[in-house]
């Protein structure tokens, strides 16, 4: 029997784009990358675990900020090359800037305009971690 992970069309780097959406509102919270291990762990632990390309290691969402993403549903697109995680965003903040969503800028009159408020100062979110999160 074919492993469910084998059905995914991983890119040349062995990664797949992963979009996190609020399971109640449908709002897109963020996009990150997953390798095979990250996706397998996400499914088994029922929480979002991504692959940090900049750090070259697993990134357990919320491990520093406390803003864990609890998995409610996992979806695969028609080309099997993008996954969507329907999540409960603990703390209501997905972005390292302290906003609900990483998509807080809108294109308006030829420029990017910030429209979402900072819900919590990033320095306060990461003060115990001792460094800035990606």
Curated annotation (Swiss-Prot):
<dbReference type="Pfam" id="PF01502">
    <property type="entry name" value="PRA-CH"/>
</dbReference>
<protein>
    <recommendedName>
        <fullName>Phosphoribosyl-AMP cyclohydrolase</fullName>
        <ecNumber>3.5.4.19</ecNumber>
    </recommendedName>
</protein>
<feature type="binding site">
    <location>
        <position position="77"/>
    </location>
    <ligand>
        <name>Mg(2+)</name>
    </ligand>
</feature>
<comment type="subunit">
    <text>Homodimer.</text>
</comment>
<keyword id="KW-0368">Histidine biosynthesis</keyword>
<feature type="binding site">
    <location>
        <position position="79"/>
    </location>
    <ligand>
        <name>Mg(2+)</name>
    </ligand>
</feature>
<feature type="binding site">
    <location>
        <position position="102"/>
    </location>
    <ligand>
        <name>Zn(2+)</name>
    </ligand>
</feature>
<keyword id="KW-0963">Cytoplasm</keyword>
<dbReference type="GO" id="GO:0005737">
    <property type="term" value="C:cytoplasm"/>
</dbReference>
<keyword id="KW-0028">Amino-acid biosynthesis</keyword>
<dbReference type="GO" id="GO:0000287">
    <property type="term" value="F:magnesium ion binding"/>
</dbReference>
<feature type="binding site">
    <location>
        <position position="78"/>
    </location>
    <ligand>
        <name>Zn(2+)</name>
    </ligand>
</feature>
<keyword id="KW-0460">Magnesium</keyword>
<dbReference type="GO" id="GO:0004635">
    <property type="term" value="F:phosphoribosyl-AMP cyclohydrolase activity"/>
</dbReference>
<keyword id="KW-0479">Metal-binding</keyword>
<dbReference type="GO" id="GO:0008270">
    <property type="term" value="F:zinc ion binding"/>
</dbReference>
<feature type="binding site">
    <location>
        <position position="95"/>
    </location>
    <ligand>
        <name>Zn(2+)</name>
    </ligand>
</feature>
<dbReference type="InterPro" id="IPR026660">
    <property type="entry name" value="PRA-CH"/>
</dbReference>
<comment type="function">
    <text>Catalyzes the hydrolysis of the adenine ring of phosphoribosyl-AMP.</text>
</comment>
<keyword id="KW-0378">Hydrolase</keyword>
<comment type="similarity">
    <text>Belongs to the PRA-CH family.</text>
</comment>
<dbReference type="GO" id="GO:0000105">
    <property type="term" value="P:L-histidine biosynthetic process"/>
</dbReference>
<comment type="pathway">
    <text>Amino-acid biosynthesis; L-histidine biosynthesis; L-histidine from 5-phospho-alpha-D-ribose 1-diphosphate: step 3/9.</text>
</comment>
<dbReference type="InterPro" id="IPR002496">
    <property type="entry name" value="PRib_AMP_CycHydrolase_dom"/>
</dbReference>
<keyword id="KW-0862">Zinc</keyword>
<dbReference type="InterPro" id="IPR038019">
    <property type="entry name" value="PRib_AMP_CycHydrolase_sf"/>
</dbReference>
<feature type="binding site">
    <location>
        <position position="81"/>
    </location>
    <ligand>
        <name>Mg(2+)</name>
    </ligand>
</feature>
